[in-house]
């Protein structure tokens, strides 16, 4: 559906607002890419950005593998190497990314990211009297502090040191918004090995990433991530091109329906796989999957009880409809996950 390419959609509005910031503040225009194929190789998704072989994100429980060598990209960083090799030095990449995850109001198996990347030549940092890493880090922080002000207005900010495989040093920018601290950007100075591999051994660079839904939910007061996928005119008609931060007005609040499922788990069971089964059957009607009880008996067998919340954004669900979905969930959970229903 490429929601980020729709100028009147909250994600498209946010993307264009970020474009506006970079176009206004940088004479060296950033090349923009928002239509790159989400099918990438394992090498592109992990190896090219130095993700360790034993990193949890490589797991079949966390990533959508099409085959052993191909995945649906987990992040827009998967295109970093190819863009560098093609001669790009300033670029923004926006696209849909895919991760196996929990089910709740802020998580969805597909969401949207934007990555920014900027390369510097030695003359730039040598003229400043700083070393390359310090120069890139200072420029990065100035850039993202300006972007945060552009999107959120005058807000209190703080920098937090963190870890990413592909940057060193690595940071997160947090803003104080609506009476709490919120992480808005993950970023850092690009690992030199990435630049060396892509024909830029004498350069330094910075990179940042952001989740469009995460920011748009706050800016537009959108309470549930599933709403971004709604074609209901009561949702889509509330937003206009160029109108950043228009507050969403809930058009209805249909009641949820709760169903519990209990089963004995095996050693290979993961909650992400359970959520994948539920989404595969209920789709957007699955609002949340929550572990509400677990215990281990005297024989060492462990039982989990999950509560599934079903709710439509657009209509009331019938008891027969929910009972049918729950029956299918029970069947598929038992057959696909090889657990024993209680």
Please give the residue ranges for each predicted region.
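Class II aminoacyl-tRNA synthetase-like tRNA-binding/catalytic domains
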Residues: 1-113, 119, 181-195, 202-204, ...
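Long mid-to-C-terminal scaffolding/interaction modules that assemble large complexes
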Residues: 91, 109, 113-114, 118-124, ...
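Short histidine-centered catalytic/ligand-binding loop motif
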Residues: 2-7, 115-137, 259-267, 318
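Prokaryote-biased recognition of long, low-complexity C-terminal linker/tail segments
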Residues: 53-66, 75-98, 104, 109, ...
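A carboxyl-terminal module marker
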Residues: 160-342
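Beta-rich nucleic-acid/ligand-interaction surfaces
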Residues: 32-58, 153-178, 293-299
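Amphipathic alpha-helical segments
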Residues: 13-26, 137-152, 273-280
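Conserved short secondary-structure elements within globular domains
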Residues: 89-99, 152-157, 287-292
